């Protein structure tokens, strides 16, 4: 077929973004031509939206993905090399899950999970396999990706406020920062995310037994053990539950342990005078530009205010159009990052 805009529009309805690619080749005489459709299946989305399955590799060829009106991602196989938006060409989008600061922010929680796992391992009647220390980080990141993907799917927008676990009681009672309209009782269901992650770690180590290999993310992806499959489904459903809670007016409040404190939270901080925020230009926020907060809506301003009032809070803000921001206090400013890696194929984790 001739390669032109008309044929691409005709084929686009049959080439669903998540499952199908349009194949194009360069004929030496006639130039670009459409040779067919390639059915990829949706597994490649797991690297983006979170999930256990692994996808077959893409050929080391030019890929062009239409990610929105006037927006293109250009890549070589899975590696994104450029992004077009608003008529301008940018470098590959920021993927905050690769940033050091976000990994460090959750480091104490990962260590806590490892210590709980090691205690369970000591008490086990049979030998357990060793786990890669990084496994808990990867599982936690995929859980967060699933949560964000679920929120985007509602096309409603929402806010997650992540607070230090030692301050859970303060945020659940009367405080100057926010008021939770629908709070959860301090019991196991509130800490369900944490329970599921630790149970996954214990189950992986148990089913591998005393084999000498170290169990990591690939083993989690490839196992067919029914207990792991059930746990993975439970994480998926929990992520979608929290995503649904985010559609209620107000913020969802969690601790760094992903302990669900409540939803429908109204952010106060009225006394906080905040007129400007810093927009990060790189993963670590070493370079930034100052912007006025009056250019954004109420949802974003309230999320910025609580980060300004309480320096240990992380806000994750989703717009109705699916744009994602992470905001926190850094270098004497509230700084936000645009999480633009929604279609970044290069991110395995």
State each model region's role:
Residues 1-349:
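Divalent-cation
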